Amino acid sequence: DDWAIIIGGDSHTRMSKGVAFGADSGTVALALATGEVTMPIPDSVKVTFKGSMKNYMDFRDVVHATQAQMLEQCSENVFQGRIIEVHIGTLLADQAFTFTDWTAEMKAKASICISEDATLIESLEIAKTRIQTMIDKGMDNSENTLNGLIDIANNRIKQINSGEKPALAPDENAKYFAEVVVDLDKIDEPMIADPDVYNEDISKRYTHDTIRPISYYSSKKKVDLGFVGSCMVHKGDMKILAQVLKNIETKHGAVNFKAPLVVAPPTYNIVDELKEEGDWDILQKYAGFEFDDDAPKGSARVEYENILYLERPGCNLCMGNQEKASKGDTVMATSTRLFQGRVVADAEDKKGESLLASTPVVVLSTIPVSYTHLRAHETRI
């Protein structure tokens, strides 16, 4: 429900169509016990966009560029401790999560993607389909909670269509702490969030504020492991992964990995959808490992071969207490975590680092194909 005010203890998975505020466990417990909570509501920062997104760029690059252009325009992080109001009305919920799940990394309190009526309805219809799939699998409870969610979605769609309650929108006279305008025309190459582990100023390491274009690395950055997963990815990312593999196979005859690529799909239902739509086939074709819930691994993996790993849906490497990369590795990941020791720990002779990027960049960083200029990236995508 885009009108819901939600309080929770998770630093990520901010609601893409509602407003969600992270809180400590005690505050959440108080809200559950009393139905009320006292929280200071910070100012908002309005983010609008101009220009056009190039067809070979990924929305993840827009998210990173938003942070970089904000710092350039404002000279300081105006998102910190505030609410980010994203004005792209045509973002479906899956895409919107790519922005709102980066909220914590922008140091903001919360964020919301303003939605047009038609887009909100489409997001609700997608949600209904996925909930129905869960019901068909026998996942509803005795109180029919999942069926109740479909009823809520249908009622919300009715409210929008009738004009009784359109999609949530700011007041015409809304006031903002600051306004940031993101120029999409300036985003002409993939953007990387770099932990900058060797910065002489220790305070500038592991901050998420160092956003660099891929050309900064001049194709000289060796990637030891790639990871596609976490709350930053959705079904579309899995389809992009499948299509990139198909494109490379068509041009080169086969796909060979120069580094391990770990893939953790968002949900089991999405895995089923990918199977129905044919995208899972090529992932299976090149997978050296595929998860099997009937024969689970006995322990977390800490050593990897140069193959594609299809892991079970979940946080995987991003969680930090499940799988881990080898100490001292350079990891290219779609996740949100670049903190020291989270995804990869330091080795005695080399710092571990987790660079964050879009799904296409992560995939291509593990495959030995020519990737020395932007045109190569455009062709692969």
Question: For each of these PLM feature ranges, what is it?
Answer:
Residues 258, 268-359:
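Thiamine diphosphate
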Residues 34-74, 269, 273-275, 279-280:
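A structural-propensity feature for long, helix-poor, extended segments
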Residues 1, 109-255, 263-289, 303-307, ...:
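Accessory "access/gating" subregions that flank catalytic or transport cores
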